[in-house]
């Protein structure tokens, strides 16, 4: 690798470490010409996840869009963003483990509901009401009675 300080072509790797659950490799390098040290990072370039919408459109998975939906579900609940980020990380990991490059928004919604069910009942009901497009009080009552049975 070329030295960013003097442009010398051949640098040495002094230290190598895996970080972020072995998805990134950090290398500490030294230039034999100018003796400066610098750090480089190697990442696996992952194929983007495409989301198949209800109407059949496909769009790239948007982490921020999912985070916004989760944040709406947990408004005025004592749940910090770190927990929401962890949920999103788990969902992305689950999708990648399936080995698919496309997934329906419905499947993502199911995954979110499973995570929220364990996290907070109110957030679960809020998310379910939007995800399942509740249009009556009876639908809320049915969901609540199902939750009580479990």
From Swiss-Prot:
PROSITE patterns for the chain: ATP_CONE
Record-linked Pfam families: ATP-cone, Zn_ribbon_NrdR
ZnF (unnamed) intervals: 3-34
Biological process, per Gene Ontology: negative regulation of DNA-templated transcription
Highest taxon of source: Bacteria
Coiled-coil ranges (or none): none
Cofactor note: Binds 1 zinc ion.
TM segment ranges: none
Necessary cofactors: Zn(2+)
InterPro entries found in the cross-reference section: ATP-cone_dom (IPR005144), NrdR-like_N (IPR055173), RNR_NrdR-like (IPR003796)
Keyword entries, A-Z: ATP-binding, DNA-binding, Metal-binding, Nucleotide-binding, Repressor, Transcription, Transcription regulation, Zinc, Zinc-finger
Domain ATP-cone: 49-139
A GO molecular function held by the record: ATP binding
Record carries keyword Membrane: no
Family (UniProt): Belongs to the NrdR family.
Function per UniProt: Negatively regulates transcription of bacterial ribonucleotide reductase nrd genes and operons by binding to NrdR-boxes.
UniProt xrefs under HAMAP family: NrdR (MF_00440)
NCBIfam families named among the record's database cross-references: transcriptional regulator NrdR
Full protein name: Transcriptional repressor NrdR
